[in-house]
Amino acid sequence: MRLNLKEFGAVLCDLDGVITQTARLHAAAWKRLFDDYLQEVAARTRSPFKPFDLEEDYRVYVDGKPRHEGVRDFLASRKMSLPPGTPSDGSDRETLYGLGQRKDKHFKVALRETGVIAYPNTVKFLHLARAMGLKMAVVSSSHHCAEIIETVGLSSLFDVRVDGHEIDRLQLAGKPAPDSFLEAARRLAIEP
């Protein structure tokens, strides 16, 4: 299949798993968070420990969602719930946002220790689209989007960035809802 880029006015790309190979870092951070937390709960309640499943749980409950929504959805799958808390909750708080902060700490460590690279074919495509004059946006629920795009040297390619900070600020629904992509299209003045 060949794409005729001249037929498009813009390119909107997800970050994790499309531009950069960060999905594995996110998955590992989620696993560490939930395995640690579930072990704590199992010890406290004297119930069996069932680990977070990277294949099923990651894809179904947390992939691409804002952290607090991923925590909520995964815990609900285990018939558990926590108070939402607030975005300012620290990682020591047993709230949806607090557990989200723990996941963020695990992700930051993995990012520092292993780094991140961009997919070469995606980089070629992005440069081609930019050379053709297309407007460009990066869309991600990650709060580290700007840092990651800068690390891989691609920040100058994008006219617009809608990331986890903007999703929180604008109270947009996380994926699979299209809200963040629609916001990027609006900012680019492009009809989706």
Label each residue range with its predicted role.
Residues 12-15, 126, 154, 188:
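Generic leucine side-chain signal with a strong bias for well-ordered alpha-helical environments
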Residues 123-131, 185:
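Surface-exposed amphipathic alpha-helices with a cationic face
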